[in-house]
């Protein structure tokens, strides 16, 4: 049976929305008309999607920084510093973990303690507890577009408050913000929650407000094979556009090998457009984001900044639209220090130097791109074959049987049988394919690549390869070579 895509009827959705927000009527004013008027009152340069479109016209790769302060004034100060000193083109606000998990009362208590002590005590910004009125101060006081980054499998209330406040971008999805983040939340629930979120975005789009919806590409950010991330981004894109989302960002979290990083983004762009065309989704704007290295950084500062430089160079030649810049002190309690600014300026300088340069799609990139597309196509085809008209149901079954499998994910709804490792060139391959629906040729290809590394390093093929690869980059290496004693 062919896949059936059906947008929730507007009146039906508004009734669903009314019933949902009834539980939070004392929390905020959820008037859509007021929110739409506020968005329309903002200048174009504060709208995330409009600025992306301008950067495409200007053939310019944009930089994006992030901040995670609990206190409002600290957050605004930090964001403005990243814009004025670090020259960031876009900014993100990281939401605290209590809000991500819908524990708003816990966030409220710690926010109150933070205000009393004049110190950020949460690991992010508790947007819902501040409410729309105070959140609009951020929009008004910061001169660049702002995105909400979170990690919530149920982002309905968070996105409601974000859009009401004037934010014009956020990331996530029913798969990408569940499987890598949560242990016990079912895909059925998270996919349904994000169906609400996507339809809400559709309502704003129908009223002339451009909202950028980024698919969260890094997943666990631990040796995720490109075909896994690309497959999930394709599926989440289809589910989003079904509900009226018009502006989507897709991307790559740096894998490590230059050829594979460039190839994976090329493969993703081609495949996304192919599936949008296949299902006759028109007028969908696709942009790309390259996430600098998300794993551990070397402890030595110069080595850490070398990794920022390496990431930027790859992003430059991938011709992405936007780079999500990382802070080498990523896990510090707050990010008011200079390391984020240093990363921004370093990234900006490399982009300025390399702006008019390019790498032609030489043979190795084309080969790897086609390899990723073959793997992705076989995963997607298997999921579609089990659809019975319902894509969400097929996605749930795909994870249950390991047709889709994210390495090192905490979710009990993820099979966790597939195991990755790098080959001798540092490309991510499959040490154990698990239940991924690959043909024998693909399986042979990966076995050969892993065997080549084994012979080159004179080591056994086992899980120790994977462990070594996980920690290699934090030691300033792409591959941690350990030969048999």
UniProtKB/Swiss-Prot annotation:
Cofactor: adenosylcob(III)alamin
Residues that hold adenosylcob(III)alamin according to the record: 123, 180, 297, 326, 330
Catalysis performed (reactions): (2S,3S)-3-methyl-L-aspartate = L-glutamate
InterPro entries reported for this sequence: Cbl-dep_enz_cat, Glu_mut_E, Glu_mut_E_C_dom_sf
Gene3D superfamilies with a match to the protein in the record: 3.90.970.10, Methylmalonyl-CoA mutase
Pathway the protein contributes to: Amino-acid degradation; L-glutamate degradation via mesaconate pathway; acetate and pyruvate from L-glutamate: step 1/4
GO biological process, one term: glutamate catabolic process via L-citramalate
A molecular function (GO) term: cobalamin binding
EC number(s) stated in the UniProt entry for this protein: 5.4.99.1
Highest taxon of source: Bacteria
Residues annotated as binding L-glutamate: 100, 149-150, 171
Keywords tagged on the record: Cobalamin, Cobalt, Isomerase
Function, as annotated: Catalyzes the carbon skeleton rearrangement of L-glutamate to L-threo-3-methylaspartate ((2S,3S)-3-methylaspartate).
Subunit and partners: Heterotetramer composed of 2 epsilon subunits (GlmE) and 2 sigma subunits (GlmS). GlmE exists as a homodimer and GlmS as a monomer.
Family: Belongs to the methylaspartate mutase GlmE subunit family.
Protein name (record): Glutamate mutase epsilon subunit
Organism: Fusobacterium nucleatum subsp. nucleatum (strain ATCC 25586 / DSM 15643 / BCRC 10681 / CIP 101130 / JCM 8532 / KCTC 2640 / LMG 13131 / VPI 4355)
Gene that this sequence comes from: glmE
């Amino acid at each position: 049976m062919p896949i059936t895509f059906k947008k929730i009827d507007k009146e039906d959705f508004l009734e669903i929305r009314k019933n949902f927000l009834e539980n939070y009527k004392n929390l905020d004013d959820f008037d859509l008309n007021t929110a739409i008027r506020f968005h329309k009152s903002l200048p174009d340069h504060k709208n995330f999607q409009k600025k992306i479109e301008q950067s495409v016209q200007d053939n310019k790769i944009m930089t994006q920084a992030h901040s995670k302060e609990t206190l409002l004034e600290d957050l605004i100060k930090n964001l403005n510093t990243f814009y004025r000193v670090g020259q960031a083109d876009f900014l993100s606000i990281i939401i605290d973990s209590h809000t991500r998990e819908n524990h708003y009362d816990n966030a409220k208590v710690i926010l109150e303690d933070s205000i009393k002590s004049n110190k950020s005590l949460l690991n992010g910004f508790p947007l819902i507890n501040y409410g729309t009125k105070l959140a609009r101060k951020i929009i008004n006081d910061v001169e660049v577009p702002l995105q909400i980054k979170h990690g919530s499998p149920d982002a309905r209330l968070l996105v409601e408050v974000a859009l009401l406040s004037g934010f014009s971008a956020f990331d996530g999805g029913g798969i990408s913000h569940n499987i890598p983040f949560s242990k016990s939340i079912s895909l059925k629930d998270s996919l349904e929650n994000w169906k609400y979120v996507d339809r809400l975005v559709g309502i704003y789009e129908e009223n002339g407000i451009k909202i950028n919806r980024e698919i969260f590409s890094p997943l666990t950010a631990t040796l995720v094979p490109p075909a896994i991330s690309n497959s999930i981004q394709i599926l989440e894109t289809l589910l989003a556009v079904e509900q009226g989302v018009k502006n989507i960002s897709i991307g790559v979290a740096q894998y490590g090998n230059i050829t594979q990083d460039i190839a994976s983004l090329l493969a993703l762009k081609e495949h996304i457009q192919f599936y949008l065309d296949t299902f006759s989704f028109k007028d969908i704007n696709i942009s790309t984001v390259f996430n600098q290295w998300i794993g551990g950084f070397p402890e030595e500062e110069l080595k850490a900044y070398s990794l920022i430089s390496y990431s930027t160079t790859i992003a430059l030649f991938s011709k992405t639209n936007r780079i999500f810049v990382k802070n080498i002190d990523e896990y510090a309690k707050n990010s008011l220090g200079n390391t984020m600014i240093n990363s921004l300026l370093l990234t900006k300088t490399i982009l300025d130097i390399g702006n008019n340069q390019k790498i032609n799609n030489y043979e190795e990139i084309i080969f790897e791109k086609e390899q990723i597309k073959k793997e992705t196509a076989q995963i997607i085809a298997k999921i579609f074959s089990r659809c019975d008209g319902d894509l969400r149901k097929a996605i749930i079954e795909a994870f249950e049987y390991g047709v889709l499998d994210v390495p090192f994910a905490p979710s009990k709804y993820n099979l966790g049988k597939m195991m990755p490792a790098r080959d001798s060139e540092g490309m991510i391959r499959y040490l154990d394919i698990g239940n991924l629906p690959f043909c024998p040729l693909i399986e042979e290809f990966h076995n050969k690549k892993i065997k080549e590394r084994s012979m080159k390093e004179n080591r056994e093929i086992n899980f120790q390869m994977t462990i070594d690869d996980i920690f290699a980059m934090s030691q300033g290496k792409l591959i941690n070579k350990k030969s048999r004693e």
